[in-house]
């Protein structure tokens, strides 16, 4: 069943795995646009025009959480659309890095509704 927020009403079990993309972030000083690039074995499958990184940056600017622009390079080691949460974990990593402080639960929930329901998983401080 699809809910009002566009997500499906499901229950999921999560298992954290030792698999990760590599993300390089640099502040851009003379441009008013982000430069996002993808490399690696799974880079060709990433939607360049609309992806979790573009979404998280756009939302952060709408909420006045960031004011700079960034060059972001992602080495895609996590298969795209595989269910491993690669895009969502990248968004969470960028959010944590750029904010560089504890993020309120309410803020995480707001981002979860726009990025993906598994986003909150990447803010859990303890393993299972």
Where are these regions (language model features)?
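ATP-binding N-lobe of GHMP and related small-molecule kinases
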Residues: 1-82, 100-102
């Amino acid at each position: 069943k699809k809910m009002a927020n566009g997500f499906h009403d499901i229950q999921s079990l999560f298992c954290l795995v030792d698999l990760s993309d590599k993300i390089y972030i640099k502040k851009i000083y003379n441009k008013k646009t982000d430069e996002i690039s993808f490399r690696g074995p799974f880079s060709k499958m990433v939607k360049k025009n609309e992806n979790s990184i573009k979404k998280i940056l756009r939302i952060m600017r709408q909420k006045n959480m960031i004011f700079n622009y960034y060059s972001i390079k992602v080495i895609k080691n996590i298969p795209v659309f595989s269910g491993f949460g690669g895009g969502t974990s990248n968004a969470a990593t960028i959010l944590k890095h750029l904010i560089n402080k504890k993020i309120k639960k309410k803020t995480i929930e707001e981002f979860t509704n726009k990025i993906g329901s598994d986003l909150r998983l990447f803010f859990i401080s303890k393993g299972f």
